[in-house]
Amino acid sequence: MILKPFSKTYEGITVLDFPGLELRPGAVYSVIGANGSGKSTFAKILAGILRTDEKKRPLGENVSVGYMPQKNYAFRMTVRSNILLGGRDEQRAQKLMDELQLSHLNGKRADRLSGGEMARMALARLMMKRFDLVILDEPTAAMDMETTLLAEKLIREYADQTGCTLILVTHSLQQARRISDETIFFRKGRMVEQGSSAELLNTPKTMELKQFVEFYSL
């Protein structure tokens, strides 16, 4: 999958200038960087929510995309009904609810869930379908460590089993190490480093990434 170069400008200021990248099927890419580095803008452009300055989709027109934003949404119906909006496979829905510890919330109104419960439901809903590319923007930010690890296991399995390319925006270096094959580091709207997660996070090549890793490892 070829991700073409693109840029994004707000009020005359370039907030993202991306050089392009070839993405591997079945691989998980973590996107890291400080607040304001361009991570979420990058995710929204790939999801088709924001337009690039070039007014073209950097992925082309025939790539199916699944997107889980930072702020999750729920319809005023049960948790199970919300999940089934992603696909009508009842067995798949039940399996995902079991694995994400949502079964006891089966009949609860989804708009009354806690933040962590809502995130798990949104993840289950997305995983009801297969996509060429899946973008998860801070999917576990509202979860505790136990459910974070459950979600990470499912995310990794989903990429492996479906063969989709998965992009995970995260603030957690530990999460990037645990589940991603490659990591992309953004700073001030630029991709500063990209490569194997183990290599990149353990032996940064640039001073910018070295300082970032040291700060977020405290």
Model-predicted regions and their roles:
Residues 72-87:
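Conserved catalytic motifs of ABC-family nucleotide-binding domains
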Residues 90-105:
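Conserved ABC ATPase "signature" region
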Residues 109-113, 117:
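Conserved ABC ATPase signature
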Residues 134-137:
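Catalytic Walker B motif of ABC-type/P-loop ATPase nucleotide-binding domains
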Residues 170-171:
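H-loop/switch region of ABC-family ATPase nucleotide-binding domains
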Residues 198-218:
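C-terminal boundary and immediately downstream tail of ABC-type ATPase nucleotide-binding domains
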